[in-house]
Amino acid sequence: DLDIIQINNDLIAITVNWSNIIQFISPDGKRVAETEDVPNNRKLATDGRYVYVSSYGHECGTIDGYVTFTKGYVAKIDVRTFEVVATCEVGYEPEGIAYYNGYLFVANTGGYAFQEDHDYETTVSIIDAGTMQLKKNIDTGQINLYGKLSQSGQYLCINSPGDYYDIP
């Protein structure tokens, strides 16, 4: 899985899932920096100052040391230092992420439900991007919220492939 986002006029971020690498490049393709502190990274969002990345992982290297999680999490990366400065635990296997008006919206899939001891997720987590504190989880009533979380103004769209068998 791969995600690409333009942070500002000078910087692009790319997640390369399973390699655990987040690559930062210039618009002309030159390598600027990279981090391997966010294992099993998935999707990206930005406010222009920070990059936010969802992760299926259960640990993360931060400026304060390693942090562990029971579920998935979102990491906040400073684009000046390329270091993880904060994290927030969300639901199992968070996927799509969007930034809007100071908040992060994170679609939780629970996508490993078929092989781990938990159910598919039905929630979107809302995080205060400034404090990286979880504000609430909204139950959508749909399982396995998978893929890119698309934003158009105040509206968010995400797909739900169900459980791939019985639930559409």
Predicted regions and their residues:
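Repeated scaffold domains used in trafficking and secretory/extracellular systems
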Residues: 1-7, 39-48, 92-100, 142-152
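Residue position within the beta-strands of beta-propeller blades
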Residues: 14, 53-55, 106-107, 157-159
